[in-house]
Amino acid sequence: VEYIPLTDNEEMYNRIQLGDTFDLLCPSEYMIMKLAAEDLIQPYPESFYDVNVETNYYAQNVSPYIAETFSAPIAESSDHTWADYAAGYMWGTTGFVFNPENANAEDMKTWDAFTNPTYNKKITAKNNVRDSYFSGLGIHYEDELLELKSQLDAGTLSSADYQARLSQMMNDTPPETMDDVEKILKNVKGNIQAFETDEAKNDFIAGRIDVSYQWSGDAVYIMDEVEAESGIACSYVVPEAASNLW
């Protein structure tokens, strides 16, 4: 097996565009959508999901939640499902990992943590289209998202309607929304230490930053390393309004 590490999804995409070929890819879901839409990846054979094949461990053991999620269409206009092109490698949430000695847990419950001057140059954001734009939408729609959540909790909004409206907001791409998100992200850029892909883990562990927007798996790694090195029990919080499931 030849294992080829890549910096991010965009590097993977560019290499494929330049003619590189791979037998198996491990991209994020938004890149799977892009690759499928451009016919740059092939569907799995039906035999991959045959539970009667002894070595099909994924098909036999995948969680019902993931199986149901992957049964949805990969795009509105597509006849293909996520499962046609992808099998789950790992999944989790995105949120803020923070040092409680230097950051307030209440501040981490809101997307405005990115622009909070208390954490000027002590907080990082993700440097990819999905998570960066999602963060901007979180700030843009935070009040509306919290109101939706309040209606759901009060029983005046059904779970299905809540999910539909949540999905609409957090996938919103008309020009006026994108313009607002662009302005928001420019404000974010002025307050954060950096938009980063992987570097924040070491920066956090070394004490150069106090807050980092992270995938939950990397957040656990950071918390374990900081506690092992300094004895500080860091925390991970998902913004109350909404967050990204990956």
Give the residues covered by each predicted segment.
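Generic structural signal for residues in well-ordered beta-strands
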Residues: 1-3, 123, 234-236
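Short beta-strand and adjacent tight-turn residues that come in two discontinuous sequence segments
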Residues: 6, 26-27, 125, 195, ...
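A residue-level structural signature of the nucleotidyltransferase/glycosyltransferase Rossmann-like core
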Residues: 23-24, 88, 95, 210-211, ...
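Extracytoplasmic/periplasmic substrate-binding proteins
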Residues: 190-246
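Early extracytoplasmic/lumenal segment of secretory-pathway proteins
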Residues: 1-38
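Alpha-to-beta junction loops
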Residues: 18-26, 40-42, 119-122, 206-214
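Glycine-rich beta-alpha junction loops
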Residues: 1, 129-132, 217-218
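Extracytoplasmic ligand-binding site segments that recognize negatively charged/polar headgroups
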Residues: 30-191, 195-203, 222
